[in-house]
Amino acid sequence: MSSWHTLAHVVVDPLPADWRDQLAKRLGQRPRRMGPWAELALYGARLCLDAAQEPALAAGAQLRVASLSGPLSAARTITGQARTGLVMPFAFMQSQPSQMLAALSQHLAWQGDARFTLSRDKQAVLQLAQQECGAAGLLIGWVEEDQRTEWWRMVLD
């Protein structure tokens, strides 16, 4: 029977004041067309892969992101814009978790099975991801906008 091995575990809490600058330096440029929640997801995911000494997420690995609230500030922005009748496309796109997954895929040089889950139960999210996962493993993160990001890179032995 296979067992799980953690290659890296990264927790950023509290967030450093310059985390966006650190991300831009790591990527070689500022991420474009991403909201703060997606940027925070990318920041944590990139730190985790760096800690695992992986330049890109392995082909066949699964990507999972979970949160209690998702991109809350973007949702608030579009709610305010909807009241005026002028919802801006960029703000709307930032409120969509699928756009965060697309940005992670692009910046991690990866294609594959990616999912976002709203949940209060980290253990249940992890167990489900592990049950669905193959030999290439899993990159799983918990992202709370303007608060913290926590990521694990795990593989089967």
Regions found by a protein language model. Name each.
Residues 1-157:
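Conserved "HGTGT" condensation-loop signature of ketosynthase/thiolase-family condensing enzymes
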